[in-house]
Each structure stands twice: as C-alpha cells, then as structure tokens.
Amino acid sequence: MAAATAEPLAVAVAVAHTATAGTDHSPAPLPPPPPHCNYKSKLQEYLQQANKQLPIYCTKCKGEHHQLKFKSTVMVDGEEFSSTFCHRRVKDAEQDAAKVAYDTLLERKETETDDTDVFELIDQDVVFSKSILHEYTTKTKTDQPEYSVTKTEGSVTPYVSSVSFAGHTYTGGAARNKKDAEQKAARAAVKSLLATNYTSMAKIVRSKEKLIRAISPSGYNKGIDSNPTNKKLPFAPIKFTPPSIFKLYDGEIDMLSVPQALFAPLVAAEEPKVRPAAEPASNPSEQAVHVSKKHKDNKVRGPEVKEERVAQ
C-alpha cells in the first residue's frame, strides 16, 4: 500500500519540478544598437550653426558588474534629453541620447510658433504675396483666389484690390497700379491664414526668404507702405550749393562761385617790359651805309684813345 502511494507522489514532484523549470524568468535581451549614424556630430553641428553651447553628456551605469547597462543624458542649452533604452556600451547610449535631442530640436524648429520672423518677411515686400497664396492653394487643394480691382479718381494711389479665397474676402491697401494692389490684397490674405493655419503657411513663406531678402533692398513699394493713410507726402525741394573755385590776383586768393567764374573776364599775366631791339634794315644799300659808318667811327675814336694815353 505504501509503495502504491509513493509512486504517484514521485510523479507529481517530477511534474512540479518541470513546471517550475519552464517558468524560470531569464533576463530580457537588450535593444539592438542604434543605426550607424553619428548623431553626436549632427547635434554638435546643429548647435554650432545656432550659436549655442556644445552638448554635455552624462552616462549612468545600472545592473550587476557582469551585466552592466548604460543610460545617457545630454544637456543642450539647459534642457536634458535622455536615451530611449539602456545599452551595453556607453558609446551607444550617448548616440541614442544625441538622436533624441537632435530629432526633438528639428521638429521644434519646424513647428515653432514664433510669428515675428514670418511676419517681418511678409512686411518687407509684397512682390511674392500672390505666388505664396497660389502655392498654398495648390498644396491644400483649394480653389484658386479671384482678384477684383477698383479705382478712385483724384488720388495718388487710386487702385484698391480685394481677393476672394475659401469663402472669405480680403482687401489690401491702396496702390499706384493694379499689379501692386493685387499683391497687397494677397498679402492681407496670407497674414490672415498665418493666424489660422500657421504651420503650412509659415513653411511656404520661409521657403521664399532668400528671394525676399534679395529684393528688399531695392525699395519696392516702401514709399507707399510707409504712407498707409494715403496722405500727400510733404514736398521738400533739394537745394544745391554750387562749388567754388580759386583765382589768384597778385598773390591773394579769392573764392568765386562757378557762374561768376565762368563769366568773369580772363586776366592775362603781366609780362616784364623789355625794350625791343632795333630791327635791321631790309634794304641792302642801307645795310652797307650802316657798316661804313661803323668803320669811320672806329677810325676817329682810335687816335683819341692814343692821345689820352700819351697825355698820361
């Protein structure tokens, strides 16, 4: 009887041991290393372009000495970003943290809500407003805008345009011609869409940044935009100051204006008075008489000189 009860007991113990062996909890495998991409270099380059401080990494160790796990945290501009998983190597943990920081900063830059730069680009120039609105309608698959222009007589800026788009009508400022009036109406629509659908419209505006920056120094429509009340600008005549030239009179310097100098009589420089020499006679007979007189004078004067020497 005892042998009969011992056999089923041994079978039960064996079954229980097998069940407990099957439910043994082994450590979960670690995640694979991150893909081969140097996110640390990308993050550092991004921060250098943004004129920010370089990232600082801090890695912590977990687990037993024979099975260590590393989790890294990177500090960027006072903000911390931690790695998603624990890794077997410190290098992989830092790359994971750099990837989290890099992806977060890029996404934040694309969806940032800083309206100042976008509105400044729109206000700088209106020449690309119609193209921006047209590109927006193409991407959102909506109907193209329709423009209407009205003219007011007796005004420096007689044209005013309105644009109908997506069930709304937007009116721009006054302009000197129809083309500028339509651009201003499109700019009013773009500003309104920035308030309601900022993300998609802001991307389109920023894509035109280089073109707007390049054309803005030309002063396109700046005179009209600076006078939104449509008042007459004050007229200020330009005064020209004629240049001066210098004239010398007997060692003194006088300053004359250009008109006076042009019509002033010219002053000739005084030449020294020199007694002109006697011109020789043109007649050959007269020249012969003149030579004979010289010989006679020499003959007469010769004895007188000798007499004076004898008297001495």
From Swiss-Prot:
Region described as Disordered? 273-312
One GO term of the biological process aspect: regulation of gene expression
* CDD domains (alphabetical): DSRM_DGCR8_rpt1
Q: Which GO terms describe its cellular component?
A: nucleus
DRBM domain location is: 38-107, 128-195
Q: List the biased-composition ranges (Basic and acidic residues).
A: 299-312
GO terms of molecular function: double-stranded RNA binding; ribonuclease III activity
Q: Pfam families, from UniProt?
A: dsrm
**Database matches in Gene3D superfamilies:** 3.30.160.20
Determine the domain of life of the protein's source: Eukaryota
Q: Which InterPro entries match?
A: dsRBD_dom
Q: Which UniProt keywords apply?
A: Repeat, RNA-binding
What is this protein for, i.e. what is its function?
Binds double-stranded RNA.
Q: What is this protein called?
A: Double-stranded RNA-binding protein 4
Organism encoding this protein: Oryza sativa subsp. japonica (Rice)
